[in-house]
Amino acid sequence: MNSLVQKVISKMNISLEEYNNLIKDVDLSSLENPSCFKNIDIATERIKQAIKNNEKIMIYGDYDCDGISATSILYLTFKKLNYNVGYYIPSRYKDGYGINENMVDIISSKGYNLIITVDNGISQIAALKKAKELNIDVILTDHHEILNDLPLCYTIVHPSLKENKEYLPECGAYVAFMLSIKLLGYVDEYLLTLASLATISDMMPLRLDNRNIVKLGIKSLQNNKYDTLLKLCDNPSFINEKTFSFSIAPKVNSLGRIIKDTKVNRMVSYLTSCSEEEQNTLLKYINSVVLERKTITDEAFKKIDLSSFQNDNVIVKVFDDVCEGVIGLVAQKVLMECKKPCVCLCYGEEGILKGSCRSLIGFNIAEALNDLDDLLIAHGGHAQAGGLSLNKENLPLFKEKINSLAKGVILKEKEKLIVDVTKDDLSEDNFLEFSKLAPFGEGFEEPYFKVKISKDNIIKISNGKHIRGSISSSCSFIGWNLGEREFLEDVYLIGKLEINEFRGKQTLNLKVEEIQ
């Protein structure tokens, strides 16, 4: 074990036994047995019966990366079984989240006998009741929290219904993947990779079965070079969990964020296409949507006069022309820039304001929304992020009260796990051994590294806006938007390690986020 890894596991309080478990190789035998899911055999038999009887089957998904991946997994599963089925990704704007009564009527009118929900359904009580009235069986596969009694349907496959096993939150695509294994009788590695992508994008805790499937998904993409996914990568030559979270997932999510009609289904078409020509046509469309999403988000952020909120405890901003799907991205940018809680809102139907909230540790946004329940139509979320809707008439009082709730609150950012290292620790060989601890993510955060550097090694670039330089012969650094200060003495750089590629050459780099 090298010096870098020793310092990391010491800081993370990881024992030698835990370390060995974390870095050990995984294979397909490491996957969870699908039979751990209650009712999965019932679901499998009903689907086999439907195939035998030539029934029409509809997969009903969701517009985020998890729902799109889950839909793609089951659609490809049926394709491998040589059975044609339908699928539908609802529009965030036209249909809303989850299967609804109107869509059940439409599905029924087209002669479907069986609906399989993926990544939705557990809270869609009225729609499932409607399906039963129309003699449509529903196999409900979902992972969202069960808040009320179980809905009435043919059967439910859900992580929290497992028997004789510790509950671990798993995403909708993971549940769909387990069902695919039961139907196919084997593990398809492309479907596994889609499930691992969704596990990362839906921020599932990276331990136990979630950790195993993500490790397998990364390895599968590295080995099999799936064109559909690699074409969505910013750097396809270096694949890790960040490839999924920062490169592929945002692109998969883009269509659901801003497309207001059924074209959101093109993302499933892309992920399930076998034709290179069709892939390239769809990819061109996807890339145009990604660019549009970035433009909308950036322009919305630029419209905010942050100085006008200097005296506010909570930033509350209403946008006239920003779509609901990007409002959370804007809220996150505001939070990162201002370091104070924010609520970003846009106009929905009939003057109703819909939006997203973001907060720092110290001000629980979910509790604040609960306290203001009488002013809101709906709300939900957790301590640092939430969503809400309210009538515009209630906006002034909402602003006043949420600012009052945040008065005197001491805010702090999430504490970084910082490992003190020397220049000699930062070598490519040491980094490669450290990388065996990956994947990092929810519940297993990637550490930051703190290293001392001479002021003479710091070079300002882009008219003094950014900094770069060398830490050692094998490690460089880059610091975006950190060039304003004067470097009159040696400093400590704090950042994360990454591999950069330029003209076919890979180098170790510290991406600096803080200077001390």
Predicted regions and their residues:
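Conserved phosphate-handling catalytic cores of large alpha/beta enzymes
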Residues: I107-S108, T117, I122-A131, I136-M204, ...
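Hydrophobic helix-and-loop "lid/oligomerization" segment in the mid-to-C-terminal part
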Residues: N2-L114, L134, L152, L184-E400, ...
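OB-fold single-stranded nucleic acid-binding module
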Residues: N394-E400, F487-Q516
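Non-catalytic interaction/regulatory segments
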Residues: F431-P447
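Structural detector for short beta-strands of small beta-barrel domains
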Residues: E442-N463, V491-L497
